[in-house]
Amino acid sequence: IVDSPNVNAFALPGGYIYITRGMLAYLNSEAELAAVLGHEIGHVTARHSVRQHSAETTTNVIGTVVSVTTGIQGVDELTGMVGTAIVRGYGREHELEADRLGAEYMARSGYDPDAMLEVIGILKDQESFEKKRAKEEGREPNVYHGLFSTHPENDARLQEVVGAARQHKTGASMRINRDGFISALEGLHFGESESEGVIRGNRFYHESLDFTLAFPTGWQIENRDDRVVAMAAAGDGFMQLKKMKLDKRMHARSFMQEELKLGGLQHGEQIRGNGLTGYTAIASGKTPFGTRPVRHIVLMRDTTAWIITGAAADRRDPYRYDRQIIASARTFRALASQDGQKARGNRLHIIRAGDGTRYRDLAAQAPLERYAEEQ
């Protein structure tokens, strides 16, 4: 299981099959889980990765398995390592073949192959929501690669492969196990987990690293594998936070010069507050907008350096966001007792719906800040 909120599943050569916890959160029965896994097993047994990729690519993919099992957290990182096709899909014909094999495996194993059709509706709704959200947030959508996401529910070919699988049923009663599966989801992390850090409004919390930082209000924040990145609402401002572990304590200015290799520091000054010492200066550097004057801020806590950088796109006004970036850096602090709940990720709680249960009422009670009802 990949610790990612994205809704996806994929197979690697050698029979390694992965499903994200984000996918688990939207399934409603053991049979639906079997449908997703059956589809991915179909890719393995049909050797789609071998048929589509070169021997060199396949070798690289197999080599990533160790990396995957020892620290890869998200589907986006895996995409960069193993290639787009494995995570995003193999094309219409291969996806349909994986569905055919998956439905047959389900029936032979005692699961109702019709659950594959149930998954289609779930994932189509999820894909529509994800595309809408990605457009509003100015990013690429993360969607499941299978035929579930590319075919409408009444697609004749998919209906045919599921129908053909029914002949392999092992008995009159097929396993679905809705209640048992849903009960097992109680307490599952939903969205970001505290092990990777949690975004609440414009503030980022990280429980295990014991810190919080408020980014400029209105900026879009993205928690990546090795850094936290924020972009101004207009897309013309950039800020990021990284950390580096040191062998010994250093002065922040010395760290900039010796470890970051920054030369030509301008407008340098010390920063103190919240139990931290630091240093800030301007130096030319690479940004998403090209080479620009970059605000560098280093905060030292014991033998850990917290590195904050920021820049603006406009060459005529390169310091447009400078005050906001510095003000944001000054909010960096250790977690306080009142931060405990905010620093913990959300978890699924299973309730039994009644005649009067409404999505809007549940959404009002949920701790989700955005898109509560849609999710």
Predicted segments — roles?
Residues 214-228, 301, 329, 333-336, ...:
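K/E-rich alpha-helical interaction surfaces of small helical-bundle regulatory domains
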Residues 231-243, 346-355:
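Short, surface-exposed polybasic-and-hydrophobic patches located at secondary-structure transitions
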Residues 340-371, 375:
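Primarily a LysM-type cell-wall glycan-binding module
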Residues 1-175, 183-186, 190-206, 212-215, ...:
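A Zn2+-metalloprotease active-site environment signal
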Residues 240-242, 256-306:
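Signature of long, low-cysteine stretches enriched in small and polar/charged residues
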Residues 18, 305-309:
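Short hydrophobic beta-strand segments that form the core of ligand-binding sensory/regulatory domains
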Residues 34, 168, 221, 308-345:
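Surface-exposed amphipathic alpha-helical segments
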Residues 199-215, 280-283, 343-346, 350, ...:
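Extracytoplasmic/periplasm-facing segments of secreted or lipoprotein envelope proteins
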